[in-house]
């Protein structure tokens, strides 16, 4: 399913780059 692939990709982004950027922004 395409949606599953997107969810996995978004989750991976959140775990790597987006996650660190968001953490810095929230601090």
UniProtKB/Swiss-Prot annotation:
Localization recorded for this chain is:
Plastid, Chloroplast
Gene Ontology terms, cellular component aspect? chloroplast
Which protein is depicted?
Uncharacterized 3.0 kDa protein in psbT-psbN intergenic region
Q: Which UniProt keywords apply?
A: Chloroplast, Plastid
Name the predominant localization: plastid
Question: Is Plastid among this UniProt entry's keywords?
Answer: yes
